[in-house]
C-alpha cells in the first residue's frame, strides 16, 4: 500500500538517497538538496511516498513569492523509484489523461491540500532539450495543457536555470480525480 508522509528528521532515507543518487536524480539524493534547499522559503513542505513501508518517492511544495506574491510552486523535487512499486509506467496517453499515475493520485492532491485549492499554484519545468525534466517538459505539460489542467505562464530564470512556469487549474484537476477513479489496483 502507498502512504505519503511529511518529511521529518526521524525518517530513515539512507537507501532512498542512495538509489536516487545511483539513478542520477541529483535533486533527490540527499537532505541538503531535497529538503534544506527550501529553508529560506516562507512556507515549505517535502513529502516522502512509501510503498509497503519503503520510501519510493518524494515531492515538495513551497511559497513562490519570487514569481508572484502569495503563490506556490508545487510538484518540485518529484521523484518515484518505480521499480519498487507495482505501478511502473503511466501506460497509454489515455490512461495518463485520466490520471492513472502516481503523481496524479498522490503527489498533486497532497500539494493542493497543503496549499489550499483556491491558492495560486504553479509547476516549473526545464525547457532545455537535455536533462531529466525533458520528458516532463515535452510530453506531460503538452497533455496537461491540451486538457486545460495547466496553462503556460512564463519562462523565467529561476534557481540557476531557465524554467517554464505553468499555472495549475487545481479545481479542474481535483474534479477529474473524482470523475476518473483509480482503475489500476496498484494505484489504490
Which residue stretches match the model-derived regions?
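Short amphipathic alpha-helix that is part of the acyltransferase structural core
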Residues: 1-33
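Short, high-confidence coil segments that cap the C-terminus of an alpha-helix
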Residues: 43-44, 116-120
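A structural microfeature
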Residues: 57, 76, 148, 153-154
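Residue-level recognition of the GNAT/N-acetyltransferase active site
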Residues: 80-83, 126-128
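Conserved acetyl-CoA-binding loop-helix of GNAT-fold acetyltransferases
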Residues: 86-113
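Conserved beta-strand-loop-alpha-helix junction that forms the acyl-donor binding cleft
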Residues: 113, 121-141
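C-terminal "cap" of GNAT-fold acetyltransferases
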Residues: 152-188
Amino acid at each position: 500500500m502507498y502512504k505519503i508522509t511529511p518529511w521529518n528528521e526521524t525518517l530513515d532515507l539512507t537507501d532512498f538517497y542512495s538509489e536516487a543518487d545511483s539513478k542520477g536524480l541529483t535533486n533527490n539524493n540527499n537532505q541538503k538538496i531535497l529538503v534544506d534547499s527550501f529553508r529560506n522559503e516562507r512556507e515549505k513542505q517535502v513529502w516522502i511516498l512509501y510503498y509497503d513501508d519503503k520510501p519510493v518517492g518524494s515531492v515538495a511544495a513551497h511559497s513562490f513569492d519570487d514569481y508572484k506574491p502569495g503563490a506556490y510552486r508545487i510538484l518540485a523535487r518529484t521523484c518515484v523509484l518505480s521499480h519498487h512499486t507495482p505501478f511502473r509506467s503511466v501506460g497509454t496517453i489515455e490512461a495518463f489523461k485520466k490520471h492513472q499515475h502516481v503523481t496524479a493520485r498522490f503527489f498533486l492532491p497532497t500539494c493542493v491540500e497543503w496549499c489550499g485549492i483556491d491558492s495560486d499554484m504553479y509547476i516549473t519545468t526545464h525547457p532545455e532539450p537535455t536533462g531529466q525534466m525533458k520528458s516532463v517538459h515535452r510530453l506531460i505539460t503538452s497533455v496537461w495543457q491540451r486538457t486545460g489542467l495547466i496553462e503556460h505562464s512564463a519562462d523565467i530564470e529561476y534557481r540557476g536555470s531557465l524554467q517554464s512556469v505553468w499555472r495549475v487549474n487545481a479545481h479542474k484537476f481535483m474534479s477529474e480525480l473524482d470523475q476518473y477513479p483509480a482503475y489500476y489496483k496498484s494505484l489504490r
